[in-house]
């Protein structure tokens, strides 16, 4: 039996993992995705400005450090596992069950599932799956791959316009198609992309994808006007889909442990990350409490708070907070390496 099971491997879950390890707890970390990072993996190239003391840098760099930190105390990690139930068997005895039927036990549970399981909405076009490993994209991992390319973006929201704006600076051309008469993203961003000669095509959708000879890459796209039905075919090097996300948050509605909720979509926190069930804590975007702000920095704070509360639940005579890292014995040897690197 572990001390704590953390459900969700985004920034809050990862920091909870680190802080629980710092507090000498054994940790199990479960995530439904194949990689840790949560929603931060959706926008790896976006620049993050609002983490205190951290210079602005691409999200993927912050994510790399966050994962490294979250794994510092060697938690037991389970990826590609969807949690379907949380059961409180007794005080300091919880069962966490996965879709595959695995049952994990721990003395406390921290829920850090963000807005739930998030997956990009798929393009509803026949044969689309054959191109997903080549030049059809649902997430932009790197802008550099689009240098000097003809790029098509489907979608008219903020994410689509953000991608269009950034990619247009290095691509040969960028075309944005969307079903409505106007984009739904910020008006200021529309002006910016227009100034960069991004071609905006309202009331237009992707009708067909035309592959190359071996059907491994998209070579042409058939575009259709949604009102007239008129079509035309255009050559593109890459196609990006930005149609929003499918969200699944059935864990909280179906779990045996019925938690008090806020607006039916977030766990109600009582002053902090405490929930209505002793021994279960919630951190990050999934929890609502009076001091809540939806920032990565706040997710870190929530994670530490949840870990501290789990510690005192498991061990009532423990200190309410952990010892500051600058004077913590657990980092003594690691600090020597860091000091030598920076001072000598």
From Swiss-Prot:
Binds 1 FAD per subunit. Its cofactor is FAD. It holds the Pfam family Pyr_redox_2. Transmembrane segments: none annotated. It comes from the Bacteria. Keywords: FAD, Flavoprotein, NADP, Oxidoreductase. The keyword Secreted does not apply. Its EC number is 1.18.1.2. FAD binds at residues 12, 31, 39, 43, 83, 118, 285, 326. InterPro entries: FAD/NAD-bd_sf, FAD/NAD-binding_dom, Fd--NADP_Rdtase_type_2, Ferredoxin-NADP_redctase_2. It is an enzyme of class 1 (oxidoreductase). It catalyses: 2 reduced [2Fe-2S]-[ferredoxin] + NADP(+) + H(+) = 2 oxidized [2Fe-2S]-[ferredoxin] + NADPH. Gene3D superfamilies: FAD/NAD(P)-binding domain. GO terms for molecular function: ferredoxin-NADP+ reductase activity; flavin adenine dinucleotide binding; NADP binding. Disulfide bonds: none annotated. Belongs to the ferredoxin--NADP reductase type 2 family. Homodimer. This is Ferredoxin--NADP reductase. It comes from Staphylococcus aureus (strain bovine RF122 / ET3-1).
């Amino acid at each position: 039996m572990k001390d704590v099971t953390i459900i969700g491997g985004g920034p809050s879950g990862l920091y909870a993992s680190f802080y629980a390890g710092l507090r000498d707890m054994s940790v199990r970390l479960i995530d439904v995705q194949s990689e840790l990072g949560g929603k931060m993996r959706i926008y790896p190239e976006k620049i993050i400005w609002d983490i205190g003391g951290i210079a602005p840098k691409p999200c993927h760099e912050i994510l790399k450090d966050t994962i490294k930190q979250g794994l510092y105390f060697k938690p037991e990690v389970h990826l590609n596992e969807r949690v379907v139930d949380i059961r409180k068997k007794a005080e300091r005895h919880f069962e966490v069950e996965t879709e595959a039927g695995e049952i994990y036990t721990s003395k406390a549970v921290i829920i850090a599932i963000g807005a739930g399981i998030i997956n990009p909405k798929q393009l509803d076009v026949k044969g689309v799956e054959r191109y997903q490993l080549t030049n059809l994209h649902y997430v932009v991992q790197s802008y550099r791959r689009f240098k000097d390319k003809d790029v098509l973006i489907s979608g008219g929201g903020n994410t689509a316009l953000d991608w269009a704006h950034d990619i247009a600076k290095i691509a040969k051309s960028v075309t944005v198609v969307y079903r409505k008469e106007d984009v739904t993203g910020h008006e200021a961003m529309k002006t910016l992309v227009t100034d960069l000669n991004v071609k905006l095509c309202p009331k237009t959708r992707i009708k067909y994808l035309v592959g190359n000879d071996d059907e491994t890459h998209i070579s042409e796209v058939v575009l259709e006007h949604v009102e007239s039905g008129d079509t035309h075919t255009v050559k593109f090097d890459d196609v990006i889909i930005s149609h929003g996300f499918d969200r699944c948050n059935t864990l909280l509605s179906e779990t045996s442990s019925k938690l008090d909720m806020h607006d039916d979509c977030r766990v109600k926190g009582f002053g902090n990350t405490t929930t209505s069930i002793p021994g279960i804590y919630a951190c990050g975007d999934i929890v609502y409490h009076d001091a809540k702000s939806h920032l990565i920095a706040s997710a870190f704070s929530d994670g530490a708070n949840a870990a501290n509360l789990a510690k005192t639940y498991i061990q009532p005579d423990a200190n309410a907070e952990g010892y500051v890292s600058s004077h913590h014995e657990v980092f003594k040897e690691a600090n020597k390496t860091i000091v030598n690197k920076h001072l000598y």
